[in-house]
Amino acid sequence: MKPKAVLIGPPGAGKSTIGRRLAQALELELVDTDAEIERTTGRTIPEIFTHDGEPRFREIEESVVRDALQATDGIVSLGGGAILSDRTRELLQGHTVIYLEISVAEGLRRTGANNHRPLLAGGDPKVKYQELMRRRRPLYRRSATIRIRTDGRSPARVVGQLVSKLQDK
């Protein structure tokens, strides 16, 4: 099996919302890897980060991503930091990977002071988000086969564009 598409992007880009709506529009299953991690471990992502650390979280995430890519022909939505793993980027090769692009300002507006996002907790949220994007943006761009901006666009409009692009594939 091979997913119809894999969604990547930073926190606040709309991966969960767009993923859910895109799956509905295409009448496909959605696999949200963050939700799968929580389901399979019985813990929240912040709990895993706090008790086991980011390296262990990324190992769990790699395994969940691998399983999701093998087990569904639907839509797979990855956590924002999944792209940091060399192994995960290797797993994405040969798949339709959609990068949901967003500006730092819009990403900050959408995520706010969300303390459920471990890598944005503590310190100046703007500085943290800018650093996160500086590090991840090149990885998102290299991994993507389709790029679409979500700033100032309704989820319905983004999904409509993606449905058109995916039907052309």
From Swiss-Prot:
This is Shikimate kinase. Pathway: Metabolic intermediate biosynthesis; chorismate biosynthesis; chorismate from D-erythrose 4-phosphate and phosphoenolpyruvate: step 5/7. ATP binds at G12, A13, G14, K15, S16, T17, R117. GO terms for biological process: amino acid biosynthetic process; aromatic amino acid family biosynthetic process; chorismate biosynthetic process. GO terms for cellular component: cytosol. The keyword Flavoprotein does not apply. Belongs to the shikimate kinase family. Binds 1 Mg(2+) ion per subunit. Its cofactor is Mg(2+). The gene is aroK. Mg(2+) binds at S16. The keyword Nuclease does not apply. It comes from Rhodococcus erythropolis (strain PR4 / NBRC 100887). Monomer. InterPro entries: P-loop_NTPase, Shikimate/glucono_kinase, Shikimate_kinase/TSH1, Shikimate_kinase_CS. Gene3D superfamilies: P-loop containing nucleotide triphosphate hydrolases. It comes from the Bacteria.
